Amino acid sequence: MRYAIPEPMLAKSVDRIPAPDAVAGGLSFEPKWDGFRALVSWDGTDVEIGSRGAKPLTRYFPELVEAFARLLPEPCLLDGEIVIALGEPGSQRLDWDALTQRIHPAESRVRMLSEQTPAMFIA
């Protein structure tokens, strides 16, 4: 069974952050990740990764596909960010250029880059 990938919730600008008790259920904050917004669909058999604009990203991140298929216990949809961090542990930085190199027509290059600079998914 394939899940339809829904449209993601997008961040929006505000003039100021409201007080936490001014919003029903409170507030949650996270940093701005320098990556690709992605929706992941796992139906128990196949993994599909789509951009926030519904463009297919699955073929560009084989290491994520393999990890999702191995680690996700049940069918689900995940909303998150694909990033690549480079540098020594403790001083890593997200690398936009390394990430954008993954969108390449040659499968051999995508596979090589997935081994040299593996991506991470932050949900």
Ranges and model annotations:
Residues M1-A123:
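Catalytic cores of nucleic-acid ligases and guanylyltransferases
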